């Protein structure tokens, strides 16, 4: 199986600094995977050399030209290796985390994700519900566009089809372009031996399940559907718990709404995870109407992330406009902290939503950092005679 030996090349602790790629490869002659986090314009040259040496690649870099991605993914297919990325926030291969992620129990679910936080959220939920994963393969945010053609998604599907440890596969993505979606569905229905859940966050169509595919529009629902494939008794138990939590959350929200004054009409959300931001946007728009966002495809409601918020606004701080020449907000939360405090000062804001992404390679003490930010935002509002509700989604495990 293609990824069986991935951890082998990670067991040696390198204490040397290398001045060239050649010297690094000589030192790790049995390596079968490499991770790149370099400026996007330099990815093609280095990635080409690594792929030709039959190394799988995890590419955290953003700002990689589209034509370079197409070239490199075709080259990867020719050499029978994975090109995970660009903008791959997370992959978890044989329990080893690349990029951001958490320690997840081993299990029988394979995850394919176009985004890092999609893999993180689904894998941590599976762990919480008592299940685990075989691998989580990040394919990059553009892989499911028609011009890329789902090259690495289809390659990852091939890997899971031939993996005896994978019983079911979860694919997590924002909306998939039509040609690629149809290609994936046809391949599963006609050739797959495994069961699939396709989580298409924000999909406008109500798609009918088939014998091999269940469709979902939210990550939590998709995880529950995967669980049903594997253990129906556990599915029923967890579903009852989730329904109870939802009812308790509704009661809490109704209680907190009584604390807001008539001017506090708007919601603001500031996210480190793009999938979490997009999923929140979809849910909110079903409840309160259109939301301004740097993830919006509607020109009327699309705003630059560093522009002032308008009415109801959700911002993904992991977008390229924020990560050019600065660390990702999961690593450096300071920029987002300042924006939270700024918008909390707006007398028309009643609710702030944030995500807190914990785990490997995230900022140290991130929980305490964000707790202090939330506390300060609430105290500032209180000094001005207002109450402020802050909702934080924590993505992580206790491992």
Q: What function would you assign to each model-found segment?
A:
Residues 1-399:
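Catalytic-core regions of core metabolic enzymes
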């Amino acid at each position: 199986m293609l990824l069986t030996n991935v951890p082998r090349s990670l067991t040696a602790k390198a204490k040397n600094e290398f001045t060239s790629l050649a010297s690094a490869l000589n030192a790790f002659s049995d390596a079968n995977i490499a991770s790149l986090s370099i400026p996007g314009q330099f990815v093609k040259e280095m990635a080409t050399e690594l792929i030709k040496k039959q190394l799988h690649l995890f590419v955290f870099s953003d700002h990689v030209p589209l034509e370079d991605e197409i070239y490199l993914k075709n080259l990867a297919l020719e050499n029978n290796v994975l090109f995970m990325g660009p903008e791959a926030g997370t992959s978890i291969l044989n329990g080893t985390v690349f990029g951001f992620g958490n320690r997840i129990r081993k299990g029988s679910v394979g995850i394919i994700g176009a985004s890092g936080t999609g893999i993180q959220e689904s894998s941590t939920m599976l762990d919480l519900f008592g299940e685990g994963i075989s691998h989580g393969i990040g394919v990059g945010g553009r892989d499911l566009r028609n011009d890329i053609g789902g090259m690495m998604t289809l390659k990852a599907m091939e890997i899971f089809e031939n993996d005896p440890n994978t019983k079911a596969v979860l694919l997590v993505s924002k909306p998939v372009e039509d040609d690629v979606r149809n290609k994936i569905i046809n391949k599963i229905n006609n050739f797959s031996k495994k069961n699939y859940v396709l989580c298409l966050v924000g999909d406008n169509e109500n798609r009918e399940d088939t014998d091999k595919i269940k469709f979902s529009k939210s990550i939590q629902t998709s995880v529950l559907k995967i669980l049903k494939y594997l253990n129906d008794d556990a599915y029923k138990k967890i579903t009852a718990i989730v329904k109870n939590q939802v009812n308790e959350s509704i009661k809490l929200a109704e209680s907190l709404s009584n604390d807001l004054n008539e001017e506090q009409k708007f919601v603001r959300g500031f996210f480190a995870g793009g999938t979490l931001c997009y999923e929140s946007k979809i849910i909110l728009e079903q409840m309160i109407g259109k939301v301004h966002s740097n993830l919006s495809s509607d020109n009327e409601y699309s705003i630059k992330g560093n522009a002032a918020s308008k009415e109801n606004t959700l911002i993904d701080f992991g977008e390229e406009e924020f990560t050019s020449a600065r660390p990702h907000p999961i690593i450096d939360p300071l920029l987002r902290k300042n924006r939270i405090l700024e918008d909390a000062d707006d007398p028309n804001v009643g609710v702030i939503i944030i995500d807190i992404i914990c785990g490997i390679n995230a900022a140290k003490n991130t929980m305490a950092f964000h707790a202090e930010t939330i506390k300060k935002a609430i105290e500032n509002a209180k000094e001005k005679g207002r109450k402020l509700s802050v909702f934080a989604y924590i993505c992580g495990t206790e491992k």
